[in-house]
UniProtKB/Swiss-Prot annotation:
Gene that this polypeptide is encoded by: kaiB
Pfam family of the protein (one): KaiB
Protein name: Circadian clock oscillator protein KaiB
Similarity comment: Belongs to the KaiB family.
Record organism: Nostoc punctiforme (strain ATCC 29133 / PCC 73102)
SUPFAM superfamilies (UniProt xref): Thioredoxin-like
Length: 104
């Protein structure tokens, strides 16, 4: 039986085209392409251009990465350069490990 893959919906909040924002986006895209190729949707929101979206989602700092789906919603604020921290913080590493086959 083939298991249906989950789709991950993520939002990345950045403040303009700063080096920190560019680095966060580049790192995140790298992680997503390696770990979740074809099963994710990423929306990048510039809080300087769309402050109302940041306010609605209660974003207080950038960069902030928010996992919307699958539930529960999870957020990581700040540095996204540590792959494992990002995956654990968004509850993605646990899901990845729990779905694997563990044989002794």
């Amino acid at each position: 039986m083939i298991k249906a893959k989950k789709t991950y919906v993520l939002k990345l909040y950045v403040a303009g085209n700063t080096p920190n924002s560019v680095r966060a986006l580049k790192t995140l895209k790298n992680i997503l392409e390696q770990e979740f190729e074809g099963v994710y949707a990423l929306k990048v929101i510039d809080v300087l251009k769309s402050p109302q979206l940041a306010e609605e989602d209660k974003i207080l700092a950038t960069p902030t990465l928010s996992k919307i789906l699958p539930p529960p919603v999870r957020k990581i604020i700040g540095d996204l350069s540590d792959r494992e921290r990002v995956l654990i913080g968004l509850d993605l590493l646990y899901e990845e490990l729990s779905e694997g086959d563990f044989e002794e």
